[in-house]
Amino acid sequence: MSKIVGSDKVKRGMAEMQKGGVIMDVVNAEQAKIAEAAGAVAVMALERVPSDIRAAGGVARMADPRIVEEVMNAVSIPVMAKGRIGHITEARVLEAMGVDYIDESEVLTPADEEFHLKKDEFTVPFVCGCRDLGEAARRIGEGAAMLRTKGEPGTGNIVEAVRHLRKVNAQVRKLTVMNDDEIMTEAKLLGAPYEVLKEIKALGKLPVVNFAAGGVATPADAALMMELGADGVFVGSGIFKSESPEKFAKAIVQATTHYQDYKLIGELSKELGAAMKGLDINKLSLEERMQERGW
C-alpha cells in the first residue's frame, strides 16, 4: 500500500497558522493546560525539558508515548513531539499517534550522524532547527515545513538564538541580490539545494516560517527575537523552570504579541519571580553544545 504524503503547501500552511505565537515545552497534561490557558498556539510534548535533559546526560530519546497521548487528550491546541535526528521509526510512531507536528530535534541524542529524515515522505509536517541558511535550505529540501533557530537549548541564554536568527536573515538578504550564476556558487558554498535557494530569492524570504528557540527565558527575550524578525517563539525550559510558570507563560505570550510595546513589556516583567537559572555558553564544551548536532 502506498503511503499518503502531505503536500508542501498544506504542511507549510499548517505551520503558517502558528505565526506570531508561542509554543511551549510541556511534560504532562497539567503543564499543557497551563500553556493553553496562557495563550500558547501549540505545545511540545516531551519527557524532560531541555535543561533536565542537559543535566541528566546520557542518551535522550523520544518521550514515552503515554506522555504524548496524555498531552494530546488534555488540550485543543496543536501538539508537537520530538524525535531523534534520523530516527525513522520514532518519527513513524509519532505520526501514527496523530501528533500535529514532529520536531526532528538536536535536543535529543541523534540516531544518525550522517542522514536527517526524508521529511517529504511523511504526511505529518516537521519542524527543524537551523543556525544558518545552509542548514535551513537543507532541511527545507528534505521537506521541513517549519524552522526554528537552534540557539542553545536548556541554557536560558538567548545569545545563540540571536546569533542564528541574525545570520539566517543576513544570508537571505545577500541571496536576494544575486543572479542565477552567483546562486549556484552560493549553493555550493553553503551545501544547499540550488532550487531551494532560487525559491528563497524569488520570495525574498524563507518559504517556511522560522521561529526563535533555544534560550528564551523572559518576556524581553521573546520580544527581542520578534524584533529581530522571528515568526514566533518556542520556549523550552524557560516556563516551567521559572519560579512562577503561570505568570511567565502569560507574560511571554503577551510580550511576543506586543513586542514593540516596551512599556507593556516592562509591566509584564514586574514581580514575575525568578527566571530559570542560566548557563554561560562559553563554559560549555563543544560536545555539550546541542546546537552542534545535525548538519
From Swiss-Prot:
The reaction(s) this protein catalyses: aldehydo-D-ribose 5-phosphate + D-glyceraldehyde 3-phosphate + L-glutamine = pyridoxal 5'-phosphate + L-glutamate + phosphate + 3 H2O + H(+)
Q: Which residues bind D-glyceraldehyde 3-phosphate?
A: 166
Residues reported in the UniProt entry to bind D-ribose 5-phosphate: 25, 154, 215, 236-237
Subunit info? In the presence of PdxT, forms a dodecamer of heterodimers.
Write down the InterPro entries for this protein, in alphabetical order. Answer: Aldolase_TIM, PdxS/SNZ, PdxS/SNZ_N, RibuloseP-bd_barrel
GO BP annotations of the record are: amino acid metabolic process; pyridoxal phosphate biosynthetic process; pyridoxine biosynthetic process
Q: Pfam family of this protein, just one?
A: SOR_SNZ
Q: Which PROSITE patterns does the UniProt record give?
A: PDXS_SNZ_1, PDXS_SNZ_2
For molecular function, the Gene Ontology terms on record are: pyridoxal 5'-phosphate synthase (glutamine hydrolysing) activity
Q: Which UniProt keywords apply?
A: Lyase, Pyridoxal phosphate, Schiff base
> Which pathway is recorded for this entry?
Cofactor biosynthesis; pyridoxal 5'-phosphate biosynthesis
Organism of origin: Macrococcus caseolyticus (strain JCSC5402) (Macrococcoides caseolyticum)
Signal peptide interval: none
Q: Which HAMAP family match?
A: PdxS
> What are the cysteine partners in each disulfide bond?
none
Q: What is this protein called?
A: Pyridoxal 5'-phosphate synthase subunit PdxS
